[in-house]
Amino acid sequence: MAPVKKLVAKGGKKKKQVLKFTLDCTHPVEDGIMDAANFEQFLQERIKVNGKAGNLGGGVVTIERSKSKITVTSEEPFSKRYLKYLTKKYLKKNNLRDWLRVVANSKESYELRYFQINQDEEEEEDED
């Protein structure tokens, strides 16, 4: 039986995993019910890195805004679900939670959409 050689990776440096999530606030910003700059400021104050809010880990997490899209980039593990949680918290704080919902439109992005209310169903209920 031939001796089995074990392959050992030399210089085992891991690649930095860069996570990039986008929040599309186009509809509410165009309608004027929400301010993207205010939302960006809220995220900067509230995102926790290593258990501390407000410091963004000294550049580990970056938040960028282009018109009505906000991009959150992280070099450390960062949950997309946490971003949804903070977005819902912002909507609740600004009394927008009744009109807007957070929907995942791709693997790395969320979109703020209005609730679809069928007016036909409401009219039928009123007639009864």
Curated annotation (Swiss-Prot):
Which named protein is this? Large ribosomal subunit protein eL22
Per UniProt, which keywords does this protein have?
Cytoplasm, Heparin-binding, Phosphoprotein, Ribonucleoprotein, Ribosomal protein, RNA-binding
Note whether Ribonucleoprotein occurs among the keywords: yes
Task: Name the gene that codes for it.
Answer: Rpl22
Q: Name one GO biological process term.
A: cytoplasmic translation
Origin organism is Rattus norvegicus
Please give the GO cellular component terms listed in this UniProt entry: cytoplasm; cytosolic large ribosomal subunit; cytosolic ribosome; glutamatergic synapse; nucleus; presynapse; ribonucleoprotein complex; ribosome
Subunit and partners:
Component of the large ribosomal subunit.
Which molecular-function annotations from GO does this UniProt entry contain? Answer: heparin binding; identical protein binding; RNA binding; structural constituent of ribosome
List-wise, which residues carry N6-succinyllysine?
Answer: 69
